[in-house]
Amino acid sequence: MDALFETYAKLRKRMALYRVRAVPNQNYRRDGTKSYVSALNRFGFQPTKPGPYFQIFEKSEEAPSMPVAPGVKPGHVWRGLFKKITGQEEPGEVTAEDQQNDSEYLCEVMIGTAWTAERQIVKMHFDTGSGDFWVRDKSFDPKKSVTWKLAEDKSWKVQYGDGSSASGIMGHDILIIGGIQIKRQAIEIATEMSAQFTEGSMDGILGLAFSKRNTVRTDGEADPQRTVVDNMMAQDDIPPEAELFTAALYSNIEEDLRSFYTFGWIDEDIVKASGEEIVWADVDNSEGLWMFSSEQVTIDDQQVRIEGNKAIADTGTPLVLVSDQVCEALYAHIPGAEYSEEYQGWTIPRETEVDKLPQFRIAIGDKEFIIQKGDLIFAPTDKGVFYGSVQSRGENSFDVLGTAFLKSIYAIWDQGRKRFGAVTKIEAFIPPTKYDRPRLTDEDRKELGVIIGYGDISSTFFEKRA
């Protein structure tokens, strides 16, 4: 590894590469059920546990050869995501209010001529589960970029099960990310957006999955464009060992400012601090996702084998989604934990001491990695319980290892060699008491200028001020 790190050091010096800070989004508010509904909308899988939300599918000979979402079975058309309404026989529509519409972290990139007045800085959500790089039309003005070139015959559209969508035009421009200048990057500008896409703080999404998941069409025909990493790899100044990107995401509120991504190099300090060698797992990208073998979990001393099981590493999902078998085994080790049909998820008693939670390990290839105990708790609810970070994947065919898991490792997406790497990330533990602050009174709200309460949660952390 020393020779490899020396190569990265030289590359960083020659190209002035730097860490891309993943800055905590101050408007992001954790909500367990909303995050789960967002996952249903994102992946399109049918829940296997009871709750208000469900999918409707229909068998059809006209179903696309590649399903519109990973959870949609071949030969089926996804009619949408719906919710049960008390007192009604007909299901209701899922709206922006039912789901999480913002990103936990925001990352700055530049579009346009580097280091000139024409460049435009946008705050993006880095998403390893999608393949489009799109920005809101109000966040990027192509008329101000002398290097922008519109592709008049191309369009794009991202659409989800609740009927929400974002769509618009496409062109090419220069992108600067982590010090790397990428020429002729396909940039999609959202000129039409549903409420789900307009309510968040991000300027857009930078997809880091494979190009198979890109939605661009030329004259109406599918024409997937190269992703950011595809274009980075195609450049002569990027050697084969640099055809990758990495992420170090931190869970503690005090640690958040340290979260970052790198493009083209692996951070030597973090790897050496772990005292471990990087563990690699081969990636199956046939669905355009970062999918690898994950056939085992361990809860304390209980080992659960799932032959042939696969998982994806997904920065676009905050939760960890696993089989019902694994969920039941995990929560059986937490006294008082139970499944809530109301919240459509597993819950943990509020009085649970974090250090009494079980050790939960998930395999990446041949090695298991532990989820830090504090990250097993996702968010409080209004019923005196916590919503767990580990939830059911329903009928989805693979696990989803979201940021609740990724915060425990230094993650490496090696696109050139089609493999995913990880080492344990050392992090001092701080109990998540800041997610459980005292509830505000009406007088408190007036004094603090609180104008919006998120769900039924009332605390200084989960409410927005004027």
Where are these regions (language model features)?
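Non-catalytic N-lobe/flap surface of aspartyl protease domains
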Residues: 1-277, 328-363, 384-399, 464-466
